[in-house]
């Protein structure tokens, strides 16, 4: 069983907790988001005692999974719509509109996912535990 050490940083008077990986827990929590599911899984398996790091690792895996499923669903919908609506010249205009809307939805999902990813890394580094609606519920079940 790994022991956690509490050190007081004299400059900021903040207690730092070292995780089982040898990193401060806030650094380990932030790094668990770095490569999504992969780093989330690594930190989730390494950290057995530190609930802060385990939650961020689990939420990283869940968030990555939810975003991945959303991309796959959007790709399937786009492929089906393109196949159906571009099959004849009478639906070409509607197909073009639907294609543009799906492209905008994909762009919003990509930029939104990136913004949430950066937000989660920053907040974990600050020692906070933001809860993303679907991902946090899944993370709680994994804990």
What are these model-derived regions, one by one?
Residues 2-63, 122-143:
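Membrane-interface extramembranous regions at the lipid-water interface
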Residues 29-46, 60-120:
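Hydrophobic alpha-helical transmembrane segments in multi-pass membrane proteins
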């Amino acid at each position: 069983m790994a022991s956690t050490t509490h050190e007081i940083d004299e400059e900021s008077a903040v207690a730092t907790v070292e995780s089982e990986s040898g990193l401060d827990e806030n650094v380990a929590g932030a790094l668990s988001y770095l490569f999504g599911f992969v780093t989330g899984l690594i930190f989730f398996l390494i950290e057995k005692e530190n609930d802060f790091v385990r939650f961020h690792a689990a939420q990283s895996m869940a968030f990555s999974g939810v975003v991945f499923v959303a991309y796959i669903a959007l790709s399937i919908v786009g492929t089906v719509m393109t196949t159906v609506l571009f099959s004849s010249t009478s639906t070409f205009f509607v197909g073009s509109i639907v294609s543009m809307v799906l492209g905008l939805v994909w762009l919003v999902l990509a930029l939104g996912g990136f913004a949430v990813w950066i937000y989660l890394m920053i907040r974990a580094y600050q020692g906070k535990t933001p809860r993303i609606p679907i991902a946090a519920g899944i993370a709680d079940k994994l804990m």
